[in-house]
Structure formats: structure tokens, C-alpha cells
A protein has these predicted regions:
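Conserved RNA-binding domains used in RNP assembly and mRNA/RNA metabolism
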Residues: 2-96
Length: 96
């Protein structure tokens, strides 16, 4: 059977802005750090500007997408792979 497509799963730690809506002293606000975020997903595209991760697939579409600026990524590590075949998306094989 012909292989449909393979995607690779990654763990990604990245830096993001942080915000707060409460009132606080200016001196306390000046000490607020950036946020370090963690994303685990399938990397479907990367270039010098961005990494695109998704978590859900149909035979043609993706969902649960996050686009992370490449410059914000601190650590990225490949943790697995998944190969999808045409039969994986045959609705009839899942019906009761």
C-alpha cells in the first residue's frame, strides 16, 4: 500500500510575552519576566521566520495549529514520527 504522508512530532520550549491585568507598583512590574512556553506537536513547516505545529489531521486538512516565531524558540527536540496511510482516513472502516 502506498504511503500517504509522514509527520514528525517535536517538543518545543519557546519564549513568549506575558501580561497581567491587575494593578501593581511600577517597580514590581519592571521585574516581571517573559514566559517560557511548551508545545508538543507535529512540525509541518519551518523556515527562518516561523515553525508551524499542528495536532489534528484529516486526509487533506490540519487543525489545532500554532505558529511560533523561529527567533522565540529556545529548545526543540524530535520525539517521534507518525505515518498515515490512505486506509487511516477511510470513514467506512470506523463505522459500527
Amino acid at each position: 500500500m502506498e504511503r500517504k504522508f509522514t509527520v514528525y512530532k517535536y517538543e518545543c520550549w519557546w519564549e513568549d510575552a506575558s501580561s497581567h491585568s491587575e494593578w501593581k507598583a511600577r517597580s514590581d512590574a519592571a521585574k516581571d519576566p517573559l514566559s517560557i512556553c511548551f508545545t508538543e506537536g507535529y512540525l509541518i513547516h519551518k523556515d527562518k521566520d516561523r515553525h508551524v505545529f499542528v495536532m489534528s489531521f484529516t486526509s487533506e486538512d490540519v487543525g489545532d495549529e500554532i505558529v511560533i516565531p523561529t527567533r522565540n524558540i529556545k529548545i526543540i527536540r524530535k520525539v517521534g514520527a507518525k505515518t498515515f496511510y490512505p486506509k487511516d482516513f477511510d470513514y467506512g472502516s470506523y463505522k459500527n
